[in-house]
Amino acid sequence: MVSSPDTTLEFTDDPARFLAETARHLAVEPVLSTVIASVTARMVRQSEGAGSAGDQPHRWWAIARDAAGVVAGVAMRTAPFAPYPAYVLPMPEDAALALARALHGRGEALGGVNGALPSARVVAEETARLSGGVASVHEHLRLFELGELVLPAAPPGRLRPATRDDAELCLAWFRDFAHAAAQQAGRTEPHAMEEFAMDEMLARIDDRIVWLWEDEAGEVVHLTGATLPANGVTRIGPVYTPRDRRGRGYASRAVAEISQQYAAHGVRCCLFTDQANPVSNHVYEAIGYRPVVDMVNLTITTPGPA
């Protein structure tokens, strides 16, 4: 535990305990907290010890409390991909500084910070200062929430849930998604993301949170995924169409139909876009998604040995 006159910072490696202690805080702005809420809920559902240490070298959650003991901010580090970034939601500046200093003090190298501004930037810049490194923005993100849905015209074919027979294709397209998104945004290197394994893909298919669009010939031409709802919010993504099938309306219609299904059951829908990708921003705004907040992915580079 780290404390100051105004803030107490507590770490835990127990996702169930974290959710129990922060449930009210996360529910205040459930769209903003979608990543931490959904990822942590998924880990609670998983069997104890699921995943290997190599897949997840860091696994913690942090709770910042004010002087009255009320939760004032949260963060986590559970990413199974290099540079294993922390994810930070809004918190007081002294809490963000305390988080960076606590990690540095225990010798935990931090290669990236994702999440809400300005807190994520404060953590990244303080980490860089302490380590003699440099914090830089890799990706500017925008979080959108569905307002009034505008259902676009349907291209030929139909949307259907993926089945286990589709698992190999779904896995390949999940893995291709980051590279395709980076290309559309004009970047040469994608931001690191989870390297999905087959068991994770099968679990998503069994949970019916992966959909495919089949064209009129029965060929699969598009994939859209989502998260299981957490605090009444689902996050749509990834949204992937192979290069030779783009521009035909598959993504717009698939996301709209999936959003319509969730909204009919009272679930709020949100998604992230890369601000540098004009294609995706236009597509989602056209079907009724509206900006909520800008977020950021930062990397921290430190000098190597002389």
Q: Can you say where each PLM-predicted feature lies in the sequence?
A:
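Short amphipathic alpha-helix that is part of the acyltransferase structural core
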Residues: 1-36, 149-190
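Conserved beta-hairpin
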Residues: 41-79, 202, 206-224
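Acyl-donor-binding surface of acyltransferase catalytic domains
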Residues: 67-71, 77-156, 298
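A conserved beta-turn-beta hairpin within the catalytic core of GNAT-like acetyltransferases
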Residues: 81-86, 228-236
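Conserved acetyl-CoA-binding loop-helix of GNAT-fold acetyltransferases
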Residues: 93-102, 237-243, 247-263, 281-286
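Conserved beta-strand-loop-alpha-helix junction that forms the acyl-donor binding cleft
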Residues: 114-120, 243, 271-285, 298-304
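Conserved active-site alpha-helix within GNAT-family acetyltransferase domains
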Residues: 118-136, 252, 276-293
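Recognition helices and adjacent regulatory flanks at domain boundaries
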Residues: 213-215, 226-227, 248-261, 272-274, ...
